[in-house]
UniProtKB/Swiss-Prot annotation:
Its main location: membrane. It is an enzyme of class 2 (transferase). This is Phospho-N-acetylmuramoyl-pentapeptide-transferase. The keyword Zinc does not apply. Its cofactor is Mg(2+). Catalyzes the initial step of the lipid cycle reactions in the biosynthesis of the cell wall peptidoglycan: transfers peptidoglycan precursor phospho-MurNAc-pentapeptide from UDP-MurNAc-pentapeptide onto the lipid carrier undecaprenyl phosphate, yielding undecaprenyl-pyrophosphoryl-MurNAc-pentapeptide, known as lipid I. Belongs to the glycosyltransferase 4 family. MraY subfamily. Its EC number is 2.7.8.13. The chain crosses the membrane at residues 13-33, 49-69, 95-115, 119-139, 154-174, 183-203, 224-244, 281-301, 343-363. It comes from Nostoc punctiforme (strain ATCC 29133 / PCC 73102).
Length: 363
């Protein structure tokens, strides 16, 4: 695709229309998948009911919480060296994860009859949301883009990941350390090596979704697609976690009603870290790491763009202390913006890619 695509060319759609298309698409998909699996869409153990309940619940709660966030002066601090179009977003409330993550988690626990697996994943999700909240709060308190130190954030992420892995170790079958490879009848026995991999996946996935949250509606929409697909994939073997995935996907859709372009609220690290942790925890618990890797394609590309940018800059640094850049700005979505894409073009194309990746996993 031509990187110099102008905002007036190609995708010409409003933020509310794009969000509505996604909501209708995911709702229809959930209904279709339930019907194909002989699940009644209005049953608690389905994809459709949790999706719709949480979409409506988080959407309604947002109308109450957003004015409260505004009153508490939780306005986002915008980087001056970022895309100039983002400067007008200064003051938009952040920390929106505090309302849609709890809605998804609570409804998932209720509909699943407080299944042990759902409670464990909910605890991990909430814990990562707490890390994000600490970071968001420090940024707001200091009125800068510096939250808690990277070392502190990483230590907390690793710590909560270790607790979750210990729970897995003592409460799940020993064959959880065997990685199933889809499309072939083969499993990869990792043994003890599974546990450092599990910790890495939890930390990496949460940070990857965090990096993707840089444009109105981008993270909420792409994660909603990934969660629904993951829920559909694990439905036959883990119905409780299917409900959890559908509920959190619905929570993202309800949040998207307020976060679509132009956004009235941002999810902040409170939301993005929690969502990444949720995806990783479900995948570890259901032996779907390969599917997670595919579903998270956008998040990983965004992360790789940052890693490549930093590495190349350091490798080409001259005597003046300045290096060269591979991208105009990282992550990738900001590079596309600076080459002429509008926010809605980036979001629309990323939604389509996320949907294609989901279809590949469900094929």
């Amino acid at each position: 695709m031509d990187a110099k695509l102008s905002p007036e060319q190609g995708l010409n759609i409003s933020g509310i229309a794009l969000a509505s298309l996604l909501a209708v698409g995911l709702g229809t998909t959930a209904f279709f998948l339930d019907s194909m699996a002989n699940r009644l869409p209005w049953q608690s153990m389905s994809l459709t009911l949790p999706l719709l309940l949480c979409a409506m619940g988080s959407g309604v709660v947002g109308f109450w919480v957003i004015p409260l966030l505004q009153a508490l002066k939780t306005g986002q601090i915008i980087r001056e060296d970022g895309p100039q179009a983002h400067l007008k977003k200064a003051g938009t409330p952040t920390m929106g994860g505090i309302f849609f993550i709890p809605v998804g988690v609570i409804i998932a626990c209720i509909l699943s009859n407080f299944a042990t697996d759902v409670l464990a994943v909910s605890a991990l999700t909430t814990s990562y949301g707490f890390i994000g909240w600490l970071d968001d709060w420090q940024i707001l308190r200091r009125k800068s883009n510096k939250g808690i130190s990277p070392r502190t954030k990483l230590a907390l992420q690793v710590g909560f990941a270790a607790v979750f892995c210990l729970w897995l170790m003592f409460n799940q079958p020993s064959n959880i350390t065997n990685i199933a490879l889809p499309w072939v009848s083969f499993t990869l026995p990792l043994g003890f090596l599974f546990w450092p991999l599990a910790g890495f996946v939890l930390v990496a996935e949460s940070n990857a979704t965090n990096l993707t949250d840089g444009i109105d509606g981008l993270a909420a929409g792409t994660v909603a697609i990934a969660l629904l697909a993951l829920g559909a994939l694990i439905a036959p073997t883990a119905p409780g976690l299917m409900v959890f995935c559908a509920a959190l996907s619905g929570g993202c859709l309800g949040f998207l009603a307020h976060n679509r372009n132009p956004a009235r609220v941002f999810m902040g690290d409170t939301g993005s870290l929690a969502l990444g942790g949720a995806l990783a925890a479900v995948a570890l618990l259901t032996n779907t790491l390969v599917a997670l890797f595919i579903l998270s394609g956008i998040f990983f590309v965004e992360t790789l763009s940052v890693m490549a940018q930093v590495s190349y800059y350091k490798a080409t640094k001259g005597p003046d202390g300045k290096g060269k850049r591979l991208f105009k700005m990282a992550p990738l979505h900001h590079h596309l913006e600076l080459t002429g894409w509008s926010e809605l073009q980036v979001v629309g194309v990323f939604y389509v890619i996320a949907a294609i990746l989901a279809a590949i996993c469900l094929a």
